[in-house]
Amino acid sequence: MDVNSPETTEKHLNEVSADAAKPNVPNPNDELLRRNPSSFPNLRIKIPTSSFSTFDGSSGYSPSRLQLRPPWPSLKRAAANPFSRQNKRRQGAGNVRIDDFSGGTGSDSDEAVEHYGGEENRAIERPEQSSRSMSEETVSSELEEEPQKVFTHTVTSWSNGFTVDDSSLKTLDDPENATFLEIISSMESPRELGQVRVQVKIISREEENYTESQAGSDSASTKPPPALAMRAKESAIERSEQSSKVLSGETDSAELQEQQQEDQPYEVVTYTVTIWRNGFTVDDDPFKSLDDPENAAFLEYMPEDNKFGVPTTTRSTSCSSQTHQELQTLAGSESTSTEPPLTTTQPPSMSSLVVDPAAPTTSIQLILADSTRIVTQFNTHHTIRDIRCFIDTSRPDGSKDYQLLIMGSPPTPLSDFDQTIEKAGIANSVLVQKF
């Protein structure tokens, strides 16, 4: 065959073109493409096929013709956006990127292998810049918060509704008002108070009804209300901007009372206990017989001084050799009263007043106009007239124009002389003579 014939030349050109059109398939026996003999069998170095030069057909495959793309374009992209998700994934440990194909999540990118040079070629970190708002205005990283003015509102809850500051009464019949008070009671600041820093003071007066004369009395007064008139319950609610949560806790009412007691000095109360042979008396209280188990327990409990809740000073006067029917003066030696000294007198004759021991009896203490104290026994069927006769007998020279009052606040006069002690309810009571 003639090698210079046109058929031979055309055939040779077709073979060369076919070989040139074949893809550049790497040689599996090449040292550069052998599996990485590391301790990680599932990891291998990925070299894209686009990194190889095109086969020119002049000779067999030569590894020396392997060319790598320069890494500068990718480095430029990394420098432009080092915090992108792609760059974060590509920056692995070591100087080459290693993809794990065991999970089937390998990348199909045809980018060339990037060679990182440690500290020198590490992705460039952008300097921290001031953040920008949506209007392209520079915003400082440290915002200077302007001081907000604190608005204080006083919410007073009544049995028939509630008031805010000096506003009119808002009844609970209105669902909106009931919801407002429910939010306040749950220690949250309602939206109606505005997007500002708010302090709410809650005062509970649920035992009394709201009247127009009481409007504004709590908001302007700083004195706490009496304990017997209402339950003192105050809560501080601090509400910041765009927040309806409570930032400051509620102060317990018990803790508030303990704090007030610590701030105030203790008051020393003095009691005078007179012990008789058949019972005892405490100050000006009625006679207490030892036949009652509760009264006997009082004498055993008294020295502990735990009954009254405050530091006490108890002065005991022993009169065990006398009965309680005898007249005694209980003026204390430490008293600085300007009243005239009390005198001890003998009890009048009981011939005009007969006491039946078998009938129900009671002890009544009489405080006469001259400050003399007389304690005697009566039957419960005796009348007020009998008590007056007893006083008249003890003071034969005294005036009969006087009133008998039941000691109390205020004193109650006994105007019905024919009323019995039982019906008047003055058993074991203290009666005062007043002209």
Swiss-Prot record:
It comes from Arabidopsis thaliana (Mouse-ear cress). Residues 150-211, 268-343 form the SEP domain. Residues 49-62, 130-141, 312-323, 333-349 have a biased composition (Low complexity). PROSITE patterns: SEP, UBX. The gene is PUX6. Residues 1-150, 208-265, 311-352 are annotated as: Disordered. This is Plant UBX domain-containing protein 6. Residues 252-265 have a biased composition (Acidic residues). Residues 357-434 form the UBX domain. Residues 112-129, 231-242 have a biased composition (Basic and acidic residues). Keywords: Repeat, Ubl conjugation pathway. The keyword Repeat applies. Residues 211-222 have a biased composition (Polar residues). Coiled coil: none annotated. The keyword Repeat applies. It comes from the Eukaryota.
